[in-house]
Amino acid sequence: MPGIVLIGAQWGDEGKGKATDLIGTKVDYVARFNGGNNAGHSVVVGDESYALHLLPSGIINPNLTPVIGNGVVVDPEVLFEEIDGLESRGIDCSHLKVSEAAHIIAPYHRTLDKVTERFLGKHKIGTTGRGIGPAYADKINRVGIRVHDLFNADHLHDKVEASLHQKNQMLVKLYNRRPIDVDQTTEELLKLGERLKPYVANTGLILNKALDEGKTVLFEGAQATMLDVDHGTYPFVTSSNPTAGGACTGTGVGPTKITRVIGVSKAYVTRVGEGPFPTELLDESGEWLRQQGHEFGVTTGRPRRCGWFDAVVNRYASQVNGLTDIVLTKLDVLTGLKEIPICVAYDVDGERHDDMPTDQAAFAAAKPIYETMPGWDEDISDCHSFDELPATCQAYVKRLEELSGCRISVIGTGPQRDHVIQINSLVD
């Protein structure tokens, strides 16, 4: 009954696909539990690369069942675009299961997301403009539309009317926009519902039965720990819970069925969008990391902000998620550096902080306290055991493990699927 949670331990884009590749052939189900199409991930199979934003990575594998859980906000138009794109390349998507309780991103959510960001100006959050936040806001305000609402015309019309009552007032009076037509929106959603219906299921029941039967389920988180709406750098966060607890609330599976929690971290740190980032490099070192690591967003194409490894963040991620293992990715990017700084603590107004400040103003003011490790020049992409790594590289990894408070079980040594060192198995 292995329930394995896979999460990002930093600000996202950590390369969770490395871990998914290692685990994917050993699992029966892959379940997305949070977020929407605001997060991109790439799946490589042979010589083919697939860029996905909403579909679980398991969609490529016909031998397992991909699941979109109730904690995900689903944009049906984006979902169908991804399905059509995969099917045009010979990938069968008929085994996909979508939770009937998942909330829908309607066209008006995207509209509100974009106009609100423009209205906020310099105070903007830095969203992707894909309607994720407004859809989650409707969920919390109890005016959201769920997947099963798309199959009853009268019921759906009432839900859309209730949802747009206040939104149209805002669009007209605050944003100087035209109101959104209730009837037209209802018709559009009904048509989307017709196509979505074959994929819809009681996914909570399916996953619990699978675990009870001894099947292995991989719970796949979007975004990452530091973007969690409760535990991240609020308000510069996403609108859901990408931390391990979200795997339970976002799928309907109880915490006692989770046996492993795997956190993925880069050997340095990146972030996209607004918000504090203590180790950010605004000089040529940051640009060097960006170019060497090809740090540009899958979803937005935006250049990622880059910085040195932050052990305070990783310790926090280990604590919040209860990590059992760390997958360390992109270690090869650091090859060629004579010295590699590691942030071991923060200086906040002259006081040393070894742990994450709960006050975000303090975190924004935090200055990194660095410890410097010697680098290496050797190409590590062909190393397939820890002992094959250069001595200074081994020392760097061991220090990150010590500072993070969790064992490093897998190391990514290059961009290809086989550029990996597995120290401990990720599946019991």
Swiss-Prot record:
Where is this protein found? Cytoplasm
Recorded catalytic reaction(s): these are: IMP + L-aspartate + GTP = N(6)-(1,2-dicarboxyethyl)-AMP + GDP + phosphate + 2 H(+)
Q: Which residues bind substrate?
A: 298-304
Q: Its domain of life?
A: Bacteria
A GO CC term? cytoplasm
How many and how are cofactors bound here?
Binds 1 Mg(2+) ion per subunit.
Which residues are annotated as active site?
13, 41
Classification via InterPro entries: Adenylosuccin_syn_GTP-bd (IPR018220), Adenylosuccin_syn_Lys_AS (IPR033128), Adenylosuccinate_synth_dom1 (IPR042109), Adenylosuccinate_synth_dom2 (IPR042110), Adenylosuccinate_synth_dom3 (IPR042111), Adenylosuccinate_synthetase (IPR001114), P-loop_NTPase (IPR027417)
Q: Which residues does Mg(2+) bind?
A: 13, 40
Question: Which residues are recorded as binding GTP?
Answer: 12-18, 40-42, 304, 330-332, 412-414
Q: In which pathway does it act?
A: Purine metabolism; AMP biosynthesis via de novo pathway; AMP from IMP: step 1/2
Residues the record lists as binding IMP:
13-16, 38-41, 128, 142, 223, 238, 302
Keywords annotated in UniProt: Cytoplasm, GTP-binding, Ligase, Magnesium, Metal-binding, Nucleotide-binding, Purine biosynthesis
Q: Which GO terms describe its biological process?
A: 'de novo' AMP biosynthetic process; IMP metabolic process
Q: Provide the primary localization.
A: cytoplasm
According to its UniProt record, which cofactors does this protein need? Mg(2+)
Q: Into which family does the record put it?
A: Belongs to the adenylosuccinate synthetase family.
Q: How does it assemble?
A: Homodimer.
Role summary: Plays an important role in the de novo pathway of purine nucleotide biosynthesis. Catalyzes the first committed step in the biosynthesis of AMP from IMP.
Q: Which HAMAP family match?
A: Adenylosucc_synth (MF_00011)
NCBIfam families registered for this protein in UniProt:
PRK01117.1 (NF002223), purA (TIGR00184)
The protein depicted here goes by the name Adenylosuccinate synthetase
- Classification lineage: Bacteria, Bacillati, Actinomycetota, Actinomycetes, Bifidobacteriales
* Gene from which the chain derives: purA
